Amino acid sequence: MTTQGSGGPTEYVRFQAVTPNERGHFTGVFGLVNRLGRAGRLSDDQEHFRRENNAWYDLAYPDPSNVDPTVYDPAVNPTATAWFKPTATHLIERVDGYLEILAAHGVECRMVRSTDPGHVIYEDDVQVVVTRREPRPVG
């Protein structure tokens, strides 16, 4: 668990599907919208929004896989998920447009908060990427 400068625990933020995918993982908001885009299901305006805002996000913060190619490698980190730090308000605020697209297509997505989202495998100023903690045997 990481602590904020105020002394309290950091509450990380993630936007994800409400139901797990075929691998048992909860796809994040960007993955959900990108999947709709790749399937050709977005309107012209939605596709324009997706492309424009994906490009903005690409410039706004580091792609963890460019820093460490194994971060999202399913053979190495099959449960890797990204969480925003609460201080990344400029990134979190722009998620609303993605949520509107998902709602228009009947795709449920929720915001999840956690002070301990998992084992941190990558961290920068605005995000952490974590994997699920393995249960510890008792006894």
Predicted region positions:
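Acidic, proline/glycine-rich low-complexity IDRs
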Residues: 100-139
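Long, contiguous N-terminal structural blocks used for assembly/anchoring
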Residues: 1-86
